Amino acid sequence: MNRAARAIRAAAAVAAAVALLAVAGCASGLRSGAEPTVTYALRAAPVAGSAKLLDVAVRVDRAVPAPGFASERILVVREDRRLDHYSGSRWPEMLPDVVTALAIETLRGSAALTAVHDQRAPFTSDYLLLITIRHFEADASGGGAPQVRVALECTLGRRDDRVVIATFTAAGSASASANRMSAVIAAYEAATQQALAVLSTRTLEALTLDTSTN
């Protein structure tokens, strides 16, 4: 390779390096100016302990999300039924994991069951609770403060013979007091707690009936 060719090659390498640095600088600038993400956590409602302890263990499998709900994003329905999400806001985990954890916490809080655990626990269980997330969104299509809707389809069955003993929908709704994020999250929590209270009550009723007849 002659001297001229080496000079051209060296100049090209320098130009490429400068271009890469410029791109990296732009990307860094974009990241530094991006809106920070705020993570919101929901709390399970305190549940009054049951007067009767059922000698059964329940396993709660990871909730199954309906289309659009397999995300950590906080969803909102806009005009024309457009499913969107609140920018700069998220749940601490994927929504199915959030719902599953809250359902387990609520059932444990009832103090009516020998044990309640998730599908990862290496323990045996007598019953299995399956949850499908049908609704978990804020509806802002009306233009005012959003209304939050939560609907969980539940199937409860025995583990030994795979017999379904109950199917029901646990639902809740709440209107945000204002069109701001803190009020929307408060409405999410209220609607979720309503739905989980129904889930706990219906689950315990079904277990009480099944254990008394078997």
Model segments located where?
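Generic short beta-strand segments
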Residues: 63, 132-137, 171-172
